[in-house]
């Protein structure tokens, strides 16, 4: 075993000891609560590092709030609604039966996840790939792997609240039906037709999350010119200027297929892609045959370049702008041809879209049930919520744009898993629309059933309906839906209402930035529609995508890490620390494996040092504390304040900066400066572990409970920035002496200067006066330079201007909060030790070569 692996195993053993000390705690309702949620992941595979990055934002914050004494609820569900699971199960069945062409092998995907193919038919081995031809096998398999990964990761999750979605879970099914009944009662749901991206394989709308390729692609209208023999060819926007001509040239490729088809009694010819869109937008379209243009049209130019669609050569004038605008504006909800003179319009995807089923998508005019997110009253209500919401400036701006942009959303589907729409049992509710207020379900789930899918009931399913949820959410006080003699059921309903009232609203919703334009804006709008204002979400945090070693994660290119692999390679604590420093904004973050390895070594060294110091404990009187002792205490406590502020702001990079690196540097400096109080070092490590507990909970828990103890220190009049400034000054002085003196010099004269040069002191005094008089004046800089010019000599002008501006903007740099002479004399031996030179300390009132905190340094 390599040295690195030995150290990793050592850390993992300590983590496991700390993990065993973590027990599920009871909720004490006399404490303040904090409710954190994260979008439940889709159960068509195991978790990867990208999932874990976003989860870590919520998880670390949950531990932080727990440290503050809150009752933290961080639940976790498993999303199974939608078509990807059904599509994969269907494709797998075809693949095992050798039916049809397979673009991506589901067998190979499942093999990459660790499953094996024992047979091509049905067998009893639950780990056999053949079992995945049943969509619900996916729903029952991947949640357990997901949970196991997150348990090993030390996630602070209340697993009693977990569940899977879809109508296989009757409790969640009733919850979604309640939601959509409520929305229908509010007149937020309507029915109609809409041009939508459509998958012919699934025979239904294909939204972004259902696509393998083409996320964000929308339907766009194109105008087709009707040429001789009713040949339809797209008109480009640059050809919008005038009249049709019988000699128009068609530019195309030999490889493009052309289809002859009829609409009612009219026969047309169009390339196959155009035909495949028209047939889903117009009634009575029938394919006649595949044809070639040769013989049908005389003016054809064949090119070898890769063109997306055939086009008309721009040597002739084709279409007036007025006609074009009329055609585009004539969008209607009838399955009829949009035609004007020698032109027709159809809708196509603006770019290639491939569904998860492998189908090349078209545009169809579909019957749809809509959530009417364009409703102005609904939007205005959401604006109130958004104005009160806490979020980063970037996230809030993106949410505001999304709210302005959002329009009707078609939610009905014909294929996949999910809940049937209560007003039309022929359709399912899509996977984005059934996932907007499910956080409320977490608050009561543990009272309703034990398992993930409602097969182990605690509350009778017969009572689950609209009246139940109205009562729980406080919209009704009627409880007559319960049998009066069923006292246990009545108690559960009361407890459910109490739990909801205790935990709602959501205090923090964490999500990837890619969900701002859909899930997160739906999340806000549905909350304001369903719940009272006091139960609207309070804070949203979003993060960017995660890169791996600076590159986009990709299985096919070998740049990929699953959660299990990451934890196996780096252990839990190093993985968590590396995720914490990856990034804290909507910009892409970067997980660097070499950094994760370095954290393994750093945590190993830290652990060894803690064991050494813990076995050499001693006590000392506060009266015996030295300057370096005061430095240690002040620095650790100030780092603690900065660390906890960074937690609150969800800037975890700074948590690692202050809580880990700065604390380590403080302890190393303490030892370098001769600090020898083991009791204080023990206290410093204890506080460091407390500060890092949310990031490395199991390792910190082990040290806090088993190795370190909380030592009581009287902090009154001890914590002061002056102690830190004094020691940092000495460290900088050592650096300057080593840098600016001759290597072979044996002796250094260190001349401390008591005062700034007279011209600087006059400038400083004048600037302080001007800041009081002109504190709100935008021209303060100009006034300062004008007033201070009298103190700055001509030979000093450039230097003087720079000094005045620096003092005006950064006065704190010039505030001397410690005794320079005291610190220099106290730590003279340390300076000599670190520079290997004899130090002679001299004092001057002022100097042209030095000033306070910047002594003259002369080797001799």
UniProtKB/Swiss-Prot annotation:
It is found in: Cytoplasm. GO terms for molecular function: ATP binding; leucine-tRNA ligase activity. Keywords: Aminoacyl-tRNA synthetase, ATP-binding, Cytoplasm, Ligase, Nucleotide-binding, Protein biosynthesis. Its EC number is 6.1.1.4. It is an enzyme of class 6 (ligase). A motif ('KMSKS' region) lies at residues 552-556. It comes from the Eukaryota. InterPro entries: aa-tRNA-synth_I_CS, aa-tRNA-synth_Ia, Leu-tRNA-synth_Ia_arc/euk, Methionyl/Leucyl_tRNA_Synth, Rossmann-like_a/b/a_fold. GO terms for biological process: leucyl-tRNA aminoacylation. A motif ('HIGH' region) lies at residues 41-51. It catalyses: tRNA(Leu) + L-leucine + ATP = L-leucyl-tRNA(Leu) + AMP + diphosphate. Belongs to the class-I aminoacyl-tRNA synthetase family. This is Probable leucine--tRNA ligase, cytoplasmic. It comes from Enterocytozoon bieneusi (strain H348). The lineage of its organism: Eukaryota, Fungi, Fungi incertae sedis, Microsporidia, Enterocytozoonidae.
